[in-house]
């Protein structure tokens, strides 16, 4: 049986890590595409030369022609300018929309049967554009945001409580921006509610526990900006790559994972016609199901606010 083919569009920081992780996990053969000649070839050669040490047989190729992504099973798009200090994800929209247009046309022409995972910012707008231009079914075009935002939230909870990140379940919904919605009510450490654990840590002081959680939420919402501020020359790339690979693996290996995915809603959660981060089952058919659950009044208000921000951003492209 032929190995799966993974096409990575954009040979920057995230693209390089994606190529390495795809190879390490033996997800399939990798084509790394970039418009800069030599860049994807150099990165893939460098990763491939580690194959005897890292013990993988996946073939890695660098490319400057969209024809080389022909027949890809899955395409992960990172192309676009990264954020710099002081910029919001939304500031990138005009430049990255032009890039996304040509990328989407390339995917439509050469990988018409592929699943597409978009990482490029501003995410909610870029994934909308990609689906519109490719014309692919919405089950095959999705955005990576929630997996990363949820991972950040879970990490901050684990560090606060001094527990293993493996045991923390936390989910973030909504848009990939400052209005994202961490679902505090269902956050737990192996089934034990996080709020209860924080209260116990602070000797039953409910007000203190709320204050601590508010700080964790705020840090989660600004986590991307925190990394940008420290790096000064770009934005996060290790964690976004890992998050996109989790999604790709769920599809390629038909894992039926329930993950927060930026998906096109058709009435779910009261939203129609917009890409928003919601829980989805990811498997061999891409987004196989959007999983709805009831939000309480506070969560609903935050979610509505987040959706309004997404609508404003997406509508600004029209």
From Swiss-Prot:
The answer, when asked if Iron is one of the entry's keywords, is no
Fetch the InterPro entries from UniProt: L-lactate/malate_DH, Lactate/malate_DH_C, Lactate/malate_DH_N, Lactate_DH/Glyco_Ohase_4_C, Malate_DH_type3, NAD(P)-bd_dom_sf
Q: Which GO terms describe its molecular function?
A: L-lactate dehydrogenase activity; L-malate dehydrogenase (NAD+) activity
Q: Which UniProt keywords apply?
A: NAD, Oxidoreductase, Tricarboxylic acid cycle
Which catalytic residues are annotated? Answer: 176 (proton acceptor)
Enzyme category, top tier: oxidoreductase
Catalytic activity, EC: 1.1.1.37
UniProt: NAD(+) binding residues: 10-15, 34, 96, 119-121
Gene3D superfamilies in UniProt:
Lactate dehydrogenase/glycoside hydrolase, family 4, C-terminal, NAD(P)-binding Rossmann-like Domain
Binding residues for substrate, per the UniProt record?
A: 83, 89, 121, 152
Quote the catalytic activity from the record. Answer: (S)-malate + NAD(+) = oxaloacetate + NADH + H(+)
- Does the keyword NAD feature in the UniProt annotation? yes
* BP GO terms, sorted: lactate metabolic process; tricarboxylic acid cycle
Q: Name one Pfam family in it.
A: Ldh_1_N
Q: Which residues form the signal peptide?
A: none
The family note in this entry says: Belongs to the LDH/MDH superfamily. MDH type 3 family.
Instruction: State what this protein does.
Output: Catalyzes the reversible oxidation of malate to oxaloacetate.
* Name of the molecule in the record: Malate dehydrogenase
Question: Origin organism of this chain?
Answer: Geotalea daltonii (strain DSM 22248 / JCM 15807 / FRC-32) (Geobacter daltonii)
Upper classification of the source organism reads:
Bacteria, Pseudomonadati, Thermodesulfobacteriota, Desulfuromonadia, Geobacterales
